Amino acid sequence: MKKASHERLRAVAVAAVIFAAVAVMTYATVRNSQRHSEVMPDTDKKTAEVDLGDGIFITGFGRYSGAYMEDGKNDTVTGIFMITVENRSEKTLQYGEITLTGSAGTAEFSISTLPPKGKAVLLEKNRMEYRSADGFADRRLNNRVFFETEPTLCGDRIKIGGLDGKLNVTNISGKKIEGDVTVFYKNFRDGYYYGGITYRAAVNGGLEPGEVRQINAGHFSVKGSTVVFVTCP
């Protein structure tokens, strides 16, 4: 019982870190949101996929050039160490930290909100340049947390419309929604989520029946983003 209690407390703590992080990323500018990379990752064909456990796999290693989105700044980088991952489980991965260690040093990657069958391109947290995957023999997924209840878009109550840098949130429930409505979104194109980061934007104070509220979503773009889940009271 003590072990289970400890695991629940750790999961809550990790989740708190996630939501604090995505809250900070909400305040970045629209200009940064529009600087999506047009350079596809260069995958090293010599590497094999890695089973990290619980249905999470590294499916590729390689280098990435383009906008560095992991810290929300979206400045341009060249030749950064990247990995591609896939969730083959039946649950959405809420958060996890992938660590690769070995003779080449330590490479760190973070991932959040990866749904079943979802694929993501993750960039090394310290912007390490990629040379080879051979020097990273130990590969682990740490602090993994899966959603206990699968997240939804609250589609029976909320309708979401997107513009570059903005989101339109409509109450379609026919009743007043008390409390905040929070929209979580990620970079997405060509079948991949780009970056482990999840952004959020919130409607504060609830919504009247039929009310439409436009909110700032600095990293959202019509062509390069997708809403992954919504929380509503």
Sequence positions of predicted segments:
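Ordered, small/hydrophobic-rich secondary-structure cores
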Residues: 38-102
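N-terminal Sec-pathway targeting helices
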Residues: 2-18
